[in-house]
A protein has these predicted regions:
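Amphipathic alpha-helical polymerization modules
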Residues: 1-92, 169-176
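Bacterial flagellar/type III secretion structural subunits and associated motility module proteins
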Residues: 2-21, 28, 90-176
């Protein structure tokens, strides 16, 4: 290989490293925000559980919960360089859709493409960082939201969050 090709490849690898590090730093910040929002949602649930709030206060807590859920969706739809961080290899479309229902509940769904296929996937994004060496540098929303419980069963946090919105709405409206 001649020196010009070596320089070209080195520049490409340096670009890939810089881009991957930037992507991972943005991802790290977004995941911190996800953790903070889930903590705030937990705090709201604990407030509701103490049973000392008036109906108006419960409605306010419900509105607060719905705002946090929408903020969670916004965070899961974070971008770096115009590309969605958590869509797996589907970086051009937002992985989460927010549905605000007429009854006051907020529902989050995995987004779908024009053919009805779920957009976020678990395919990795890869970058060549040296000759013969590549790295995976992303995490998908499915990997974030599908967790294992104590028995090893998969729990979809999206379903749990949607159930919380419905439950909070029912409580705020005196249905529970």
């Amino acid at each position: 290989m001649n020196i010009n090709n070596e320089i070209k490849y080195t520049e490409k690898y340096n670009y890939n490293i810089d881009e991957s590090v930037g992507w991972m730093n943005t991802t790290d910040g977004a995941l911190d925000n996800v953790g903070n929002l889930l903590g705030e949602i937990k705090e709201t649930i604990l407030k509701v559980g103490n049973g000392t709030y008036s109906q108006n206060e419960m409605k306010s807590l419900n509105e607060d919960m719905n705002e946090k859920i929408k903020q969670l969706a916004d965070t899961l739809n974070s971008t770096h360089g115009g590309k969605y961080l958590f869509g797996g290899s589907s970086v051009d479309d937002a992985p989460i859709t927010v549905i605000e229902n007429p009854d006051g509940t907020v529902k989050l769904e995995f987004s779908k493409d024009k053919n009805g296929q779920t957009i976020p996937n678990t395919d990795d994004l890869k970058a060549d960082i040296s000759s013969g060496i590549n790295i995976d540098y992303n995490i998908s929303v499915g990997e974030i939201l599908n967790i294992k419980d104590g028995n090893g069963n998969t729990v979809n946090l999206l379903d749990e969050i949607n159930n919380l919105s419905t439950l909070m709405n029912d409580i705020a409206n005196g249905d529970e």
